[in-house]
Amino acid sequence: MSRVEEIRRVAIEHHHRVASRFEAEYAALENSRFSSAFTYGRAKIDKMVDELFRSLPRGAAILDVGCGTGEHLKRALRQGLKAAGVEPAPAMLEVARRNVPQARIEDGVATRLPFGDKEFDAVILIEVLRYLDRPDIVLALREAHRVLRPGGKLFVTLVNRWSLDGFYLHQRARQLLKRSSFNPTNPYCLFHTPGSAKRLLERTGFTNVRTEGRLLGPIRILYKVDAGLGRSLARVLEPFDDWLHRASWTRRFAGHLIAIGEMPKG
């Protein structure tokens, strides 16, 4: 098995193991976005996903690649869209099919989508590309390009290299101690900057690419120090958090990096 395949395998097995945790986190999110660092960060992403869905005409077709427990498929259906998903982790797939029986959800991987050319008006990859090595990321983006219609939209999240939560430095320290860029017992993580994310999408054929930042990184640290402290300060800091990441120079320090591109219309 090649390094790229091993990284992909570990990611799938990890998400198979944590399916019940994801389901519980999303249940908590329905009650309060401040429940955990996970729910707070996902609420930021979900707000942008909802904006994307609202920009589409009723009946438009969306594909959620790595759909997990199916939460974004439910959001799409509530907006009057046609929703399809693909998920390789067996436990995640089972939960998604149970949660969203009205959506078409296939067993498959981002690098080989089980759909025809030009089937969708939008493709989203939420916290998927971060777990793949570079060759698989390129393949996944090419597959998204293939299944999108002219003028279709792509929405992906990536891990910001210089996020103020210090995750990149933490990962680098672990790699140096283990003298390896990949530990087969833990999921891989590939970091990007706004500039590298923009170039990545442009090189795979997307146009009008823009990047956004969401989530003040230190809020994650506060949750880890003390969950109650994290919840309290997240409520206080949220207005500042949202304002801060509207500025172009601050997005490189955000906890979540989002890249949005379009298919050429011609």
Locate each region found by the language model.
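Conserved class I S-adenosyl-L-methionine
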Residues: 2-57, 59-66, 155-177
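A conserved beta-strand element that flanks and buttresses the S-adenosyl-L-methionine
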Residues: 124
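A short glycine-rich, Lys/Arg-flanked "PGG" loop and its adjoining helix->strand segment in the class I
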Residues: 138-150
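Acceptor-substrate binding/catalytic loop of class I
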Residues: 179-196
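A C-terminal cap/extension of S-adenosyl-L-methionine-dependent methyltransferases
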Residues: 199, 209-266
